[in-house]
Amino acid sequence: MTESTFPNYPRLVLSKGREKSLLRRHPWVFSGAVSRLEGKANPGETIDIVDHQGKWLARGAWSPASQIRARVWTFDKTEPVDIAFFTRRLRQAQHWRDWLAKKDGLDSYRLIAGESDGLPGVTIDRFGHFLVLQLLSAGAEYQRAALISALQTCYPDCAIYDRSDVAVRKKEGMALAQGPVTGELPPALLPIEEHGMKLLVDIQGGHKTGYYLDQRDSRLATRRYVENQRVLNCFSYTGGFAVSALMGGCRQVVSVDTSQDALDIARQNVELNQLDLSKAEFVRDDVFKLLRAYRERGEKFDVIIMDPPKFVENKSQLMGACRGYKDINMLAIQLLNPGGILLTFSCSGLMTSDLFQKIIADAAIDAGRDVQFIEQFRQAADHPVIATYPEGLYLKGFACRVM
């Protein structure tokens, strides 16, 4: 397709001086940068983005209900947004995942990581021959049919299941969506393999797309710290860290979560790997309350894993989230024996690594303990971060030695 045969896209005109982020290839246009929309565009429809003088900058998706008014599909003026576009993006992403899966022996991984794979608002996780889809923006939803067609071209033997039941869709003016798209339904619990572990994944009812693939490498790293140690696994979900700790030779692992269903799957995961169930304890409780109760009882641990859910959704919640992270890490530090290890994480995108490190330092001061930072973590390599979109680095963590 030549430029002259392109559709006459509506044009989003930016205010003077507001094109700088696009010139640096950042994929978002915020509402404050917009001067006007020339022409009519439905939510999610493709638009051209131009500066105040009409100079072409990018091609993206219009989202009038969101503070992010447009998300960029391409910075190439000659590239149309069609089925072939999505097919190219999928194949580019698969090339890296194929190498990674072969190298690490994976049958499950993140296939598309949104903006970092050139598909803003699109998340696709692969579990065996199931592709689990999340469409989180108006543009992604508008292109649903094209994206599914591209998936069927690239992965004709895979079933597709939609888990777009995510609250963020409401910010884009969209209803939640969930259910089979093509192929058979996923089983209630699908076994996958990760670094020598067998793990059961609940695609239909589990968190996110069913499992936290981003913590794969952190779960493996846990093994070096746990031999003959007593481990506390907070916010344990379905027990990936617990299974890894048992494979690393821990003396005991206590897994804590508020969901009994998740704890039941965690127990099954221990049994599935033929590990010693007598070394695993499963506690349904609120982590904050339980840590305080442990402190009052004088309980001590050698390793504590702290992997909480996202505490902050927007900037207005950041200060409160900082207090929450500090309190929970302070409690964990107080429960550790001298020389104990705290493995602590934040999956909040607004929480920078530097800020998180400062929070842990403040927590150590409040706990009256010295802490050494000995290892740093981030999301696994199938969750890449494109250089022009630093927000893609959402998961950060530290291994800390508590003196």
Curated annotation (Swiss-Prot):
Name of this chain's protein: Ribosomal RNA large subunit methyltransferase I
GO molecular function: RNA binding; rRNA (cytosine) methyltransferase activity
GO cellular component: cytoplasm
Alphabetically ordered keywords of this record: Cytoplasm, Methyltransferase, RNA-binding, rRNA processing, S-adenosyl-L-methionine, Transferase
Pfam family, one: PUA_3
Lineage start: Bacteria, Pseudomonadati, Pseudomonadota, Gammaproteobacteria, Enterobacterales
Role played: Specifically methylates the cytosine at position 1962 (m5C1962) of 23S rRNA.
Record-linked SMART domains: PUA (SM00359)
